Amino acid sequence: MITARRVARELALLSAAQVLRQPKLLDESDCRSLILMAVRTLASDVRDTLEQAGTELSESQRLLRHSEFQLPHLEKAQMVLQDALQRAEKGLNKIGAALDLPEILYFAHQEEVQAYAIALLRCLQRYQNEIEELVNRSMVDWQLERLTQLDRAIIEIAVVEMRYLEVAKQVAINEAIELAKRYSDEGSHRFINGVLRRISEALDPAQAATGN
């Protein structure tokens, strides 16, 4: 389910790298400019995703025609048919992903969404040193610098919510997992979940002691 805050997190994620490159603290106007760029990126994603879906579906149709008229051998025809079906499935999955994007774009223009995205970005920049220290302490046999830029931003946005914006820890973790599933590599969400759970326990020693 798409919510205003989920969209705000996506906008913050798409803007995070630019924010962390800035040598001085950004004001609200600077953040709004970055968010506008993020909205344009989302709009571009809609077009790209639909174009890719069309390409996959067209290729699947071509392969099916090829297998019907030019492949008399059953085994080879079956291989081509399997490839065609995989491409068709990939195209349909891309269309399914694109269906959410118009609603995301609708939310992205709302003031409450942009205001929350700005709060995330400004906290991310203002408390960067504290956030990095907390994340590094919670990594097991890993270092923050070795994370992909995307995974690092997802983790740090969740830390901002848990530590500075008083979002319930489990909510922040769950939302980070959803961001990872949407934007990061397959399997990254499990790693991110583990890191954030350790951070949650570090922020709440009583929770760590009881195991809840």
Swiss-Prot record:
The keyword Iron does not apply. It holds the Pfam family NusB. It comes from Thermosynechococcus vestitus (strain NIES-2133 / IAM M-273 / BP-1). Keywords: RNA-binding, Transcription, Transcription antitermination, Transcription regulation. GO terms for biological process: DNA-templated transcription termination; transcription antitermination. GO terms for molecular function: RNA binding. Involved in transcription antitermination. Required for transcription of ribosomal RNA (rRNA) genes. Binds specifically to the boxA antiterminator sequence of the ribosomal RNA (rrn) operons. Belongs to the NusB family. This is Transcription antitermination protein NusB. PANTHER family: ANTITERMINATION NUSB DOMAIN-CONTAINING PROTEIN, N UTILIZATION SUBSTANCE PROTEIN B-RELATED.
